[in-house]
């Protein structure tokens, strides 16, 4: 899929985590850097929408551009701000706290965007709680409807999406949508990665 733009949202308060989720490291890599590097493997341009670009300037983010957010007003408004900069037909929207995100899944989804019905404004995974709005694709032309919804006081992705046609993306493994919202979530993901690490070589007798 050519001419794809990505938007990564890094404007949350991280109140439940107690620290900036974007800077939490998993296997030594900050989450924002991890997500942006995957986004850059799928998209020509990656925008990072955040009120605090200075927090993240030290990260290794090749090909990424910061879009300073005026204030933390929620992901829907952050997305609208980023979408206003997009020139491509499709945009990949990602949260910054997806430690199990897999580039091959995103690339497969992107490769099939040409088959999404014309009336659909988005292509997203769906689960028991509804749409997963922060790991999927949107058509640029949805911006006017999005702005109208926001101007009417809307702030919920779920409420906005229920008024529009959305294509369901097949989810090969639900775990890629796992996000780190709490210290308990972080402990789970770090424990799983630790379990995947190779065991240290046993010390030889007499060494």
Swiss-Prot record:
It catalyses: Mo-molybdopterin + GTP + H(+) = Mo-molybdopterin guanine dinucleotide + diphosphate. It is found in: Cytoplasm. GTP binds at residues 9-11, 21, 97. This is Probable molybdenum cofactor guanylyltransferase. Its EC number is 2.7.7.77. Signal peptide: none annotated. Transfers a GMP moiety from GTP to Mo-molybdopterin (Mo-MPT) cofactor (Moco or molybdenum cofactor) to form Mo-molybdopterin guanine dinucleotide (Mo-MGD) cofactor. GO terms for cellular component: cytoplasm. The keyword Transferase applies. GO terms for molecular function: GTP binding; metal ion binding; molybdenum cofactor guanylyltransferase activity. Mg(2+) binds at residue 97. Gene3D superfamilies: Spore Coat Polysaccharide Biosynthesis Protein SpsA, Chain A. The gene is mobA. The N-terminal domain determines nucleotide recognition and specific binding, while the C-terminal domain determines the specific binding to the target protein. Belongs to the MobA family. Its cofactor is Mg(2+). GO terms for biological process: Mo-molybdopterin cofactor biosynthetic process. InterPro entries: MobA-like_NTP_Trfase, Molybde_CF_guanTrfase, Nucleotide-diphossugar_trans. Keywords: Cytoplasm, GTP-binding, Magnesium, Metal-binding, Molybdenum cofactor biosynthesis, Nucleotide-binding, Transferase.
